[in-house]
């Protein structure tokens, strides 16, 4: 696994650089406009380019339910579906699913669609496969985001499941016939506001060997 981030400048602990993906590069720090269903509301692809956007964040939960991953895939992935020729990142859908109070076990999360009431189950393997079909330049592994405030026992369970799912999601990504040639996959660190669990989660996620890493489970109820 080669490094995809290249540091170009630092200042008092902050740093700027470039991230390289199979589909192109973007500079950091980077603001990613949100295109929940692939497109950013009220803005055309040209508008986004004129504003200097480099990466658009799309939502796996919504895209897999409407219009459906098959539609996006058959249109050539997110680039063909939206017309946006810049880079894109898809989340795993986990945050939206966990807001629906799903039935969660070690296998995955079962939830009811907010569109038609149908029942679905998303697993780490399924999330990796769906995002491979959506074709974003960066996909995120499925994780467990515990709402805050939460007891240490609940956060511990989230960390353990996140770590186990990270291993499974990474294997599914690496086993996919061509995902590695088209995408990067990022792991997600959990742990709530518990420093020890955050540290443990970071270490366990690093050991899996993702292309990049995200800090998950923030801005969901913590006081600061």
Predicted regions span which residues?
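Non-catalytic, usually N-terminal nucleic-acid engagement modules in DNA/RNA processing proteins
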Residues: 1-178
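Glycine-rich phosphate/ribose-binding loops and adjacent secondary-structure elements
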Residues: 172, 176, 180-224
